[in-house]
Regions:
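Metal-dependent catalytic core segments for phosphate chemistry
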Residues: 361-386
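Phosphate/NTP-binding elements of NTP-utilizing enzymes
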Residues: 1-354
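Generic beta-strand structural signal
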Residues: 160-162, 358, 370
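Coil-to-beta-strand transition motifs
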Residues: 173, 358-362
Length: 389
């Protein structure tokens, strides 16, 4: 039987096993479907389908091909969540969208399509849209992709004027601009949409402050949006960690947040990192924008190199790594451990040591205990962000 919307269709595929997703994606769709059924929020099919039709009829590929985009079911469901879930006043529920997804799954195209829709058809006169990143060069990636996307469509390109620092749509007084970090000078912004590219690479306090500045500036808009889209990365204590902590707390039921929409495409079982079925959980576009053969080749390389494996886990599995260079296999370390308690070693001879960090290093406390000719090691790591010291 036909489904009333793409959210239900995607959820049906998940629950019947036709579509392979990880636990976090399953949880968000369980939350959404339950919320629609019990009246926590409403679904506006007209708004959702309007965005989908616009993207598929006006937004073009801009690398390797120039035909119109054709959204996959997972993308149609995501667009439906962003633009179709509303409150009783028909105002969109979600103001922060956090998408974690594997490399080569169309992140930039998706972000560019969202920019195009909100610039041309969202009905916000005087909209200000920012492509944000630590450096202008990175911010320009999504910005330039958006421009190339609309450049291929005459009906859109004739309305847009590319100026020195932005793209301007006179008809709606809308400006789209790339923006590098400068939290001190961001207080005057009034964004309708902020697209944060590869937030996993945003370092420490700078990224956190810039995100909060832009988030606090959303208040003057009726239906604003911050879209953060990224693969996993290597940076600690940044906005990626913050968004991940908020997202997982929300999905576990430990948070009362209502405006955050996390779509976390990640593998569940790290030991199955080289299993194609498991990899589908982090790569919903497998077989479309990225082929299974590509993954087989990358797996073959990663199986022979710990550093390549760390990169593969990070970029294709979305399992965050502390370093791009691994010197110990995490599986080997994990299997070497035993489930023992420190309390079981009372009155034993022990030697302890601590590592007191001064900058961004890990702080650790370890103790080695000898009993019966066997050495037992207990280690505890304390990772403290600079902002908390």
């Amino acid at each position: 039987m036909p489904f009333s919307n793409y959210i239900y269709e995607y959820y049906d595929g998940i629950t019947t096993g036709k579509i392979v997703v990880g636990k976090w994606v399953r949880l968000i769709y369980e939350y959404i479907v339950s919320g629609l059924q019990n009246g926590l929020f409403l679904f506006n099919a007209k708004k959702a389908n309007k965005a989908i039709r616009f993207i598929e009829n006006f937004c073009h590929h801009c690398e390797g091909r120039t035909d119109l985009l054709k959204l996959e079911l997972w993308q149609k469901a995501a667009v439906s969540l962003i633009f179709g879930i509303v409150d009783e006043d028909n105002v969109r529920i979600f103001r922060e969208v956090f998408i974690v997804i594997g490399r080569k799954n169309g992140k930039t195209l998706f972000a560019s399509a969202v920019i195009a829709y909100m610039a041309y058809l969202d009905g916000e006169y005087g909209a200000k849209i920012y492509c944000l990143a630590p450096k202008l060069e990175q911010a320009n990636i999504v910005y330039d992709n958006f421009f190339q996307m609309i450049k291929k469509e005459p009906e859109l390109s004739e309305l847009a004027k590319k100026r020195r620092s932005d793209i301007y749509i006179e008809e709606s007084n809308t400006a789209i601009k790339p923006l590098a970090f400068n939290a001190k000078k961001s207080d005057g912004f009034n964004p309708h949409l902020v697209v944060n590219d590869e937030v996993a690479s945003w370092r420490g306090d700078g990224g956190l402050k810039q995100y909060e500045v832009m988030k606090s500036a959303l208040g003057a808009r009726r239906q604003p949006l911050i879209l953060s889209i990224s693969t996993a990365g290597y940076e600690n204590d940044g906005i990626f960690d913050e968004l991940m902590a908020r997202s997982t707390a929300f999905l576990k039921g430990g948070s009362k947040e209502r405006r955050l929409l996390p779509l976390l495409y990640m593998i569940d079982d790290v030991e199955k990192w080289n299993d194609l079925e498991e990899l589908k959980k982090a790569n919903p576009n497998m077989g479309v924008s990225v082929s299974p053969e590509f993954f087989k080749e990358e797996i073959a390389v990663a199986e022979m190199s710990l550093s390549k494996r760390a990169e593969f886990l990070c970029k294709y599995c979305n399992i965050k790594q502390n370093s791009s260079v691994a010197w110990l296999d995490y599986v080997v370390v994990d299997r070497a451990g035993e489930k023992i308690k420190l309390e079981d070693f009372k009155d034993s001879y022990a030697v302890g040591g601590i590592d007191l960090s001064q900058t961004t290093d890990l702080t650790a406390a370890s103790v080695i205990i000898e009993r019966g000719g066997v050495l037992y090691a207990f280690t505890q790591f304390f990772k403290i962000g600079r902002a908390h010291v």
